[in-house]
């Protein structure tokens, strides 16, 4: 019976930790969503200001004004898309729900630890305790209708690969590092792509303005 409770304790530990990981991942996703909204909002305003201040440079470069306008429109579309994605996925509220559920599971894990330490004989009463603990575990786990992803669970296992409970999996260090890298990027990779595309799209505008400005300022120009 003690072995059974130890196994249940491992399951609770694994579930609660995976849900902590899921909560952290969703919070990071929400943060990058907010940063992206701010970034693209600033870009839209900056392009409008640049087009106004450097009107002469824009007029001197064919198609540059239309290109900058297209970038402003694209940034506006991304703002709408990210806002809708954030509203639909409810990352913040889901993260809070997962975190609270993980806290409940942690409390149950401590109770299981206490019962393991109290067990001295294999008796009917002991098995009744185990059944009650299992029922409580199932109840708490089902109380949260948002589940963690398999990647959150895998990240937990690889992070504790040297623990006796998971040593049999023989997970190598490079595998753990790769899972950690993938887990970190899993919730933000598309935001990073948006940032890179946005920054790359601004290069022609800034380069053209700089080139025309230097040409205009060159002695003898015109």
What is each model feature region?
Residues 1-37, 87, 92-188:
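Conserved non-transmembrane functional hotspots
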Residues 27-93, 176-221:
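Alpha-helical transmembrane segments and their immediate juxtamembrane boundary regions
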């Amino acid at each position: 019976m003690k072995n059974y409770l130890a196994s249940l304790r491992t399951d609770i530990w694994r579930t609660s930790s995976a849900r902590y990981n899921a909560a952290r991942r969703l919070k990071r996703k929400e943060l990058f969503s907010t940063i992206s909204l701010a970034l693209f909002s600033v870009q839209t305003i900056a392009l409008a200001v640049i087009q106004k201040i450097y009107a002469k440079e824009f007029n001197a470069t064919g198609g540059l004004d239309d290109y900058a306008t297209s970038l402003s429109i694209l940034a506006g579309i991304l703002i709408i898309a990210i806002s809708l994605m954030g509203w639909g996925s409810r990352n913040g509220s889901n993260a809070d729900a997962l975190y609270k559920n993980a806290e409940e599971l942690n409390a149950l894990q401590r109770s299981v630890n206490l019962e393991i330490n109290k067990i001295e004989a294999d008796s009917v009463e002991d098995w009744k305790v185990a059944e009650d603990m299992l029922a409580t575990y199932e109840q708490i786990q089902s109380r949260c209708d948002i589940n963690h992803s398999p990647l959150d669970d895998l990240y937990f296992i690889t992070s504790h690969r040297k623990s006796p409970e998971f040593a049999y999996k023989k997970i190598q260090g490079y595998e753990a590092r790769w899972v950690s890298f993938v887990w970190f990027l899993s919730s933000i990779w598309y935001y990073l792509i948006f940032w890179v595309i946005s920054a790359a799209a601004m290069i022609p505008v800034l380069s053209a303005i700089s080139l025309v400005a230097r040409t205009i300022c060159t002695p003898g120009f015109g």
